[in-house]
């Protein structure tokens, strides 16, 4: 059994390394004393504001269009409770535990910066859920990404209050029972605390981070599978000459070209048709333009990453508590508007779709005997009796086409809510949520390409590919045997897809990617 990692969560110090650790496995988190001091000071500021007996939005008023309705001090706790139960209106399947864990951690680091006005008990309640692996039941649908992720974060908060449901060891149970089982007390929310918990972009950001991690994984595996396809189709490595890419200057293009040069280097298949022996003047774009297309994908993945890392460390609730010369003040703003996350998710969708689109084109090339450098039709002996990879390509085409539709930017849509008080929204939650489905589609496409490219390498009997490509081919053959005649192919596709998703094919050439990503 793997030991659970313990981390001290420093506000504004979340890195991609930490975020990925939290995404991939349970953690035990603590906060430094300095964070608790900031939390305590901010809570005392809220008490000072209440004692002034003046209206302060989010503290002693209603919400949204009801912001001008003053709430008496004796109803402030009821106000917060009513806020949570009335906003717990999500629908759809529950978000998975790893995404919910990211949500809660980012909410903790936001509250711990000391401008949200909550008590330390609120933060400790969240840490109790995280550290005891209690996952609030958060329905996936119901947020428009402004004013924050209100509905899903309300479901999270409901669990802290001992209401609704949670998941423990994969089982759905009453939140009250789970808290009692782990010795945790349900929290009663005080002034400002409910709004601080549900006003924020943490759900959209967590879903976008999942898409970001998947996009990186897909690009890395698609690069080595793309090299495997080049060699299988007897493609040229000349288009990856560093000089071509340096005179254009795009970081991603330069790095992807470098990777292909190194991955193909030393291939006997490539040497067999080098120079005058190579009668193909130019390869189709899906082979020779991989640096230009996949490099552009790398660049926008990096751009999305920069945005998401900032947002992961951000305070995005409203109002926020600051100090003027004459004392504390609650200032209303709009940090809850998740437009940056929506834009980041939209460009990740473009990258994921294009990675799959290029992979589908390489599959089409490999099964086409007029383009594939001497490979048999549909990558199988005795074609006609055997159909080979004919319909596997149809599956890839279907998924690539589906992704193109799903990739339509969600951020260009907006629909007014809350009686037109919240009249422009980001749709960030949808933008980010769809990335998972798109990534699964693209992983399947790359898996099919891996099968096809591996098949092509096997047909070059007597000629070895390069060392890194041989390792990738061997890892494939450990899971899937050579396709010598027609057989039930769906299990092979699923096995290859898992190789794509688990990063197996990308492990042995990690040093070639040392300069790919701007944010660590």
From Swiss-Prot:
GO cellular component: cytoplasm
Alphabetized UniProt keyword annotations: Cytoplasm, Histidine metabolism, Lyase
Chain ranges passing through the membrane: none
Modified residues annotated as 2,3-didehydroalanine (Ser) in this record: 147
Record-linked PANTHER family: HISTIDINE AMMONIA-LYASE
Family of this protein: Belongs to the PAL/histidase family.
Name this polypeptide is given: Histidine ammonia-lyase
């Amino acid at each position: 059994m793997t030991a659970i990692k313990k981390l001290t969560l420093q506000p504004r110090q979340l890195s991609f390394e930490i975020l990925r650790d939290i995404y991939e496995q349970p953690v035990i988190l603590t906060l430094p004393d300095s964070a608790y001091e900031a939390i305590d000071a901010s809570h005392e500021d809220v008490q000072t504001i209440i004692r002034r007996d003046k209206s302060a939005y989010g503290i002693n008023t209603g919400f949204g269009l009801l912001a001008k309705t003053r709430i008496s001090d004796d109803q402030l706790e009821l106000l917060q409770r009513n806020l949570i139960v009335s906003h717990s209106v999500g629908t759809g399947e529950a978000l998975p535990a790893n995404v919910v864990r990211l949500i809660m951690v980012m909410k903790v680091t936001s509250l711990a910066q000391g401008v949200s006005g909550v008590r330390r008990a609120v933060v400790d309640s969240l840490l109790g859920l995280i550290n005891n692996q209690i996952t609030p039941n958060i329905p996936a649908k119901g947020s428009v990404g402004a004013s924050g992720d209100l509905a899903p974060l309300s479901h999270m908060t409901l669990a802290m209050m001992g209401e609704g449901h949670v998941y423990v060891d994969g089982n759905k149970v009453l939140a009250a029972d789970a808290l009692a089982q782990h010795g945790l007390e349900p929290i009663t929310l005080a002034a400002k605390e409910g709004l601080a918990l549900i006003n924020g972009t943490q759900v959209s950001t967590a879903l976008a981070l999942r898409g970001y991690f998947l996009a990186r994984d897909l690009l890395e595996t698609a690069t080595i599978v793309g090299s495997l396809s080049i060699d299988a189709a007897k493609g040229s490595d000349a288009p990856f000459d560093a000089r071509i890419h340096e005179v254009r200057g795009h970081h991603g293009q330069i790095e992807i070209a470098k990777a292909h040069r190194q991955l193909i280097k030393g291939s006997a298949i490539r040497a067999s048709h080098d120079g005058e022996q190579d009668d193909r003047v130019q390869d189709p774009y899906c082979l020779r333009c991989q640096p230009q297309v996949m490099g552009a994908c790398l660049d926008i993945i990096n751009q999305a990453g920069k945005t998401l890392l900032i947002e992961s460390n951000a305070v995005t609730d409203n109002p926020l508590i600051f100090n003027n010369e004459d004392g504390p003040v609650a200032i209303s703003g709009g940090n809850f508007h998740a437009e940056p996350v929506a834009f980041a998710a939209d460009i990740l969708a473009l990258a994921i779709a294009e990675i799959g689109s290029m992979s589908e084109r390489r599959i089409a090339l490999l099964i086409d005997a007029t383009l594939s450098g001497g490979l048999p039709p549909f990558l199988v002996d005795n074609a006609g009796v055997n159909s080979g990879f004919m319909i596997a390509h149809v599956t890839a085409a279907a998924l690539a086409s589906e992704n193109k539709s799903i990739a339509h930017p969600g951020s260009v849509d907006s629909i007014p809510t809350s009686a037109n008080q919240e009249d422009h929204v980001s749709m960030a939650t949808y933008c980010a949520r769809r990335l998972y489905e798109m990534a699964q589609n693209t992983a399947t496409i790359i898996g099919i390409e891996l099968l096809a490219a591996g098949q092509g390498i096997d047909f070059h009997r007597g000629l070895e590919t390069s060392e890194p490509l041989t390792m990738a081919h061997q890892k494939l053959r450990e899971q899937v045997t050579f396709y010598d005649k027609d057989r039930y192919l769906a299990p092979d596709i699923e096995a290859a897809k898992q190789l794509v998703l688990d990063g197996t094919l990308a492990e042995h050439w990690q040093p070639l990617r040392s300069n790919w990503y701007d944010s660590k």
